[in-house]
Amino acid sequence: MSLWFLVFLSVLQGVTELFPVSSLGHTLLVPALFGMHIDKHAPQLLPFLVALHLGTALALLWYFRARWIALISGFFAQLGGRKNDDGHLMWALIIGTIPTGIVGLLLEKRLERVFHDLRIVAVALIINGVLLWVGDRIQRSRAHQAPEKMTFKQAFFVGLAQIGALIPGFSRSGLTMIAGNVAGLTAEKAAEFSFLLGTPIIFAAGVLELPKLFHARDQLMDALLGGVLTAIAAYLSVRFLMRYFEGRGRLASFGVYCVIAGVFFLGWFMLHPQPV
C-alpha cells in the first residue's frame, strides 16, 4: 500500500465513521471512483482495518472521557442501589448495544458480500440522505427530552437503527441520530448518544480482530500509522460535529450531500460498471 493511499484511507475512515454519511459506503465508492478496488476481506488489509477501528474508538473515548467516567461511576452506584441519571443512561447504552452486537456477529460478512455492487451502495447512500432529511424534520417538530430520561424501549429502538449500517451506504451515526430524534432528543443530544452508543461497537470491531494485527508484523508500522491518522481525523470530526449540533446544525445538510453524492456515484457506476 502506497503512503498516500494509506493516508487517504485513514483520514476517510476517521471522518466518515462519525459524519452521518456512511464510512463503509465511502470506503467502497470513493477509491473505486479513482480506479482502485479494495477487497475488505483481503488478509493483508485486515490488520490495517483493525488499527483504523481502534483509532476511531480511542478518539471517541478520549473526547468523551469525562462523560464515560461519570457514566461508569453512575452505573456502579446504581448497582449499589443508588438510582441516578448517569447509571440509567449507562444501562440504556448497554441495552442499545445488544441488537447490533448480535446481528453484526451473525450477518455482517453476508450483508457486505451481497451489497458490494457499487450501484446498490450508491442507492443506499441516496436513501440514507432522504432519511437524514426526514429525521431533521422530526427533530424540529417534536418536544425534547434529555438522554438520561430515555426509556429502555427507546434505547433499544435506537440500537436497532444501528443494524441498518451493516449495509454499505447507510450511516451508523446517521441512523442512530435519526432514531434519537424520533425518541425526542435534540440534535446535539442525539449526536452525543449516537457517539456514546457507537464507541463499544467500533471498539469491539477492532478488538475482535486484534490477534491478526500482531500476527502481521511486517504490516505493523502501516497499521500503527493508519491508526494514529484515523484517531486524529476522528477526534477533529467529533469535535466539529458536537460544536456543529450545539450551534443548531441540521442533519438535513448531510442529507443533501448524501443524495447529491449518491446520484453522482450511481450515474458514474452505471456508465462505468465495476466487477462485483
Curated annotation (Swiss-Prot):
GO BP term, example: regulation of cell shape
UniProt name for this protein: Undecaprenyl-diphosphatase 2
Assigned keywords, A-Z: Antibiotic resistance, Cell inner membrane, Cell membrane, Cell shape, Cell wall biogenesis/degradation, Hydrolase, Membrane, Peptidoglycan synthesis, Transmembrane, Transmembrane helix
Transmembrane spans: 1-21, 44-64, 87-107, 114-134, 150-170, 190-210, 220-240, 251-271
GO molecular function: undecaprenyl-diphosphatase activity
The keyword Transcription regulation is annotated on this UniProt entry: no
Stored InterPro entries: UppP
Encoding gene per record: uppP2
PANTHER family from the UniProt entry: UNDECAPRENYL-DIPHOSPHATASE
Originating species: Burkholderia ambifaria (strain ATCC BAA-244 / DSM 16087 / CCUG 44356 / LMG 19182 / AMMD) (Burkholderia cepacia (strain AMMD))
